[in-house]
Amino acid sequence: MWIFSRRILSAALAAGFVCTAVCGPAIAAQKTLSTDIVIVGAGSAGLTAAVQAAEKGANVVLLEKNFFVGGASNFAEGIFAVESELNRLRSDTLTREEAFKHAREMHMYEVNVPMMRDYIYGSADNVDWFMKHGVKFDVIRMTPWEEATWHVIGEYKGKNHGAALVANLKDQCDKLGVTTLTGTPAESLITDKSGAVVGVKAKSKTDDYTINAKAVILASGSISDSNEKVAEWAHRDAKHWHS
């Protein structure tokens, strides 16, 4: 029995060696796509952008380097908002301007003030948009002495919190005909002679993609894992800064 098994093993190893030596690595297929919009990153930002674009009639290709969509958004609990419809139903009194003033003070004014203002003033619209798309929220106070700004994401198809939001958005992308390519990280932007961005180069384990597009949206996530980008954009020593 041992001799028989050893012969089988030897034959299998020999066959594998021959295949490796003769066949070599598989050559990636070259694929070219043309679309209206290509979005890099299928977290909550990328998924939301894909839904909005597809609803307006655009053809959308959504790229994600992981083999699942959502990224860190799957582990989120909720989102911040002031003066949302849910806040009004609760008779919460905090205004966007009050929240904006408090946030600037808490961050000692070391922030991009116009961007922070846009975020706070647009937060209610974000929640209202999600609610119109079937996302459920419960508004809570993070602590007894804070205002009720935390909108905890409710259940969707047996999932809760961030995973529920991601599942909801992915279902809508599928219904709207968005082409989602997981396991396919973007590698570089395509530019024309004038320097305008006209597409994306991407690569999966089996395919090399050239995706020509009228517009490119970068929604690839936080810079907090890159010390160089934190230093460049946040103007802080990333070695001593924890996000």
Regions flagged by a language model, labelled:
Residues 40, 82, 218-219:
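Redox-cofactor binding/interface segments in oxidoreductases and associated redox assembly factors
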